[in-house]
Amino acid sequence: MNQHLAVITGCSSGFGLLSTVELARQGWTVVATMRDLSRRGALDESVSRAGVGERVSVRLLDAAAHPTHAAFAEQVLADYGRIDLLVNNAGFAMGGFAEDLTLDEYRYQFETNFFGAVSLTKAVLPAMRKQRSGRIVNISSIAGRTGTPAMSAYNASKFALEGYSEALRLEMAPIGVYPILIEPGSFETGIWYHKENVAAAAADPNSPNAVRTGRFRDYIQKTLHRADANAVARLIAHVASVPSPKMRYPIGTDAKMLLALRLLLPWKVFETLVVKKMGLGL
């Protein structure tokens, strides 16, 4: 049994898969979770290729199935005796202009991106408090720091996660438990490719935003391949063990540039630049 135990959500692809392999390579025991075990093939292949199979346990967990989280944490503790790191990675991006999104679509976005992270965090906090140590890495986004057209549901869920993480950090840091935010920019993770993650009204040619929705999709496709997602996995492994972790870690050239523009430019100038760059003018 390894001394360091990590629980990671959303491990069938993207940051979850890559961080599972990276942490296991560095000696961690990893409980890698996903909501559909039939999609574990890519993770199993990556783990096998890296030669870290003995350090990875793949388990069923739906981040949006909140009533199951306490029992899941209890089982992990029964099996391993401790939880040193929780990576709340599971999430998705609900696309669509605010005018087209329904309240149910907003709720659907929040169930995983926000309430899922809160529920799992609550499930592991008692063990971390008892240990007087632990890290909770919440995978946020640059979208949690500045609004993005056609992404208001995603923005809102990540802004909520940022505020929650700040408050939790102030509450838990004095006892040795450190919530940490990682804020990626545009990385290739597959998060944008699911049709169910787009507002139903976005497919309606009669939507007042039909043309602009098409322009936004084109923009997203052009910016997806900017950076290697392994950089985020390496950052997760770094903050898992660095002695004094920061509150926030923006990552990606575009994330840092957007943050700088948002902080330095007057709102009207920033607004004009974003609308023009994304081709969202009427």
Residue ranges and their predicted role:
Residues E99, T146-S152:
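Active-site loop immediately N-terminal to the catalytic Tyr-X3-Lys motif
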Residues A173-T223:
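C-terminal beta-strand-loop-alpha-helix "lid" module of Rossmann-like NAD(P)-dependent dehydrogenases
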Residues F97-A98, E105-R107:
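Substrate-binding pocket helix/loop in short-chain dehydrogenase/reductase
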Residues S141:
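Residue(s) in the substrate-gating loop at a strand-loop-helix junction
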Residues L60-A71, L103:
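The beta1-alpha1 cofactor-binding region of Rossmann-like NAD(H)/NADP(H)-dependent oxidoreductases
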Residues S12-G14:
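Conserved glycine-rich cofactor-binding loop
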Residues T121, S157:
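Active-site helix of classical SDR
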